[in-house]
């Protein structure tokens, strides 16, 4: 089970972009990877197509393993681990392990 969701703000813990923050654009559950905005950028060579769209070198985000990111906790100013808690009304929510604060309910 992945505890990271789309639109979460995360911090990169390991790799060439260690320390960078960004928003999760997409969660790839089957690979346990996430696409993070402006993190792990790669260059791809694109051919021009028949409709006149120009080719060239395009920079885009590559997936990063979920174990290399942590959700950003504004209260502590860094990455934090996540747990789950059931509220009185029976709703299951994500909470930060360090301070027990509820993470953005939907």
Curated annotation (Swiss-Prot):
Note one Pfam family from the annotation: KOW
Q: Which InterPro entries match?
A: KOW, Rib_uL2_dom2, Ribosomal_uL24, Ribosomal_uL24_CS, Ribosomal_uL24_KOW, Translation_prot_SH3-like_sf
GO term, biological process aspect, one? translation
Enumerate the GO terms in the molecular function aspect.
Answer: rRNA binding; structural constituent of ribosome
- Keyword Ubl conjugation tagged: no
Q: Which UniProt keywords apply?
A: Ribonucleoprotein, Ribosomal protein, RNA-binding, rRNA-binding
Query: What is one cellular component GO term in this UniProt entry?
Result: ribonucleoprotein complex
Name the domain of life this protein comes from. Bacteria
| SMART domains linked to this entry | KOW (SM00739)
Ribonucleoprotein as a keyword of this entry, yes or no, is yes
Q: Which CDD domains match?
A: KOW_RPL26 (cd06089)
Oligomeric state and interaction partners are given as:
Part of the 50S ribosomal subunit.
Q: Which family does it belong to?
A: Belongs to the universal ribosomal protein uL24 family.
> Protein name, please?
Large ribosomal subunit protein uL24
Gene designation per UniProt:
rplX
